[in-house]
Amino acid sequence: MLDYLNIRRDLHQIPEIGLEEYKTHAYLMQVIDGLTAGLDFVEIRTWRTGILVFIKGSSPDKTIGWRTDIDGLPIVEDTGLDFASTHEGRMHACGHDMHMTVALGLLEQAVSTQPTHNLLFLFQPAEENEAGGMLMYEDGAFGDWLPDEFYGLHVRPDLKVGDIATNRGTLFAGTCEVKLTFKGKGGHAAFPHEANDALVAASYFITQVQTIVSRNVDPIEGAVVTFGSLHAGTTNNVIAETAFLHGTIRTLTQEMNLLTQKRLREIAEGLAQSFGLELDLELKQGGYLPVENHPDLADELMDFFQKEEGVQLIDIEPAMTGEDFGYLLSKVKGVMFWLGVDSPYALHHPKMTPDEAALPFAIEKIGKFLDYKINER
């Protein structure tokens, strides 16, 4: 039997950012090879740093998929753990080390005997930065292994161990990264009439884009437009020639995301024209679509866990966090859910430390659900 704690702690020490998960890939392959050696009903494929493990059913009518992400974040860890990151400036601050450990535990259970239906395990790279699920899908990595149903989880620090939370609709927001540069003309602060101040235009832009949420978005639906970074100028008495802004759009429907992108572009172009500035605008959504659960499959999953002893099932509201599993769920029906890990620190925090008691709980309970799915008639 796998030692879940050691696996999680090993993985926690080697976080790597998207499409650079080389040590992680090697570690996972070593464990997977050990679990599947000599099994003629298991096949393995790789795609860059991603791994696909296909368990062929004895008389399959469908393929069930389980997806986990494997990348870390560019964060300096501050947990003080004995098994803290050994990679400088990298951390598993989003719990993907927990996700991988759960997936390996589920794989161990799944290969103990050949199931009736097919089961695919996807160890997906680059969730955080490059929408690895979309890259794999578009590159044909799944081939004829593409599931009929896809399932996955994400740890959640503000939920307790034993909590599983999901809903029958949108669970995560769709996100769009925004990069924007206004370019004017620099000059001496004493002679503003001889310059064209990009910083003034950027200031107007920051306030004007807030009207998208207040005046263009259905208040029942909601949206987020946040700019967390603004860089302009070099010193106090020089007018800024350029101003760079970096932000995000988050919405619960793709239609609203596209509307928000449209309005942001119109405001930026209008301000650039009115101030006589050049504009460089990049809107990058990629594969970060809203995570939309399939209502019938969500009903089935929620009913299953509602009846499972030791599980506290929560019908939860959507969150404005983003997840590239939304892209795969736009291609394959499925369900994502939260797994409680009871940490006082939020996801992406340098002190985020999940409760490892969630590992055996998740592997046992989710294992029962997958066993039901791959052996049902």
Curated annotation (Swiss-Prot):
Top-level enzyme category: hydrolase
EC number per UniProt: 3.5.1.47
InterPro entries: AcetylDAP_deacetylase, Amidohydrolase, Bact_exopeptidase_dim_dom, Peptidase_M20, Peptidase_M20_dimer
Keyword Amino-acid biosynthesis listed: yes
Active site: 69, 128
A single BP term in Gene Ontology: diaminopimelate biosynthetic process
Signal peptide (from-to): none
Catalytic activity: N-acetyl-(2S,6S)-2,6-diaminopimelate + H2O = (2S,6S)-2,6-diaminopimelate + acetate
Pathway assignment: Amino-acid biosynthesis; L-lysine biosynthesis via DAP pathway; LL-2,6-diaminopimelate from (S)-tetrahydrodipicolinate (acetylase route): step 3/3
Keywords in alphabetical order: Amino-acid biosynthesis, Diaminopimelate biosynthesis, Hydrolase, Lysine biosynthesis
Job description of the protein: Catalyzes the conversion of N-acetyl-diaminopimelate to diaminopimelate and acetate.
Family: Belongs to the peptidase M20A family. N-acetyldiaminopimelate deacetylase subfamily.
NCBIfam families, alphabetized: amidohydrolases
Record protein name field: N-acetyldiaminopimelate deacetylase
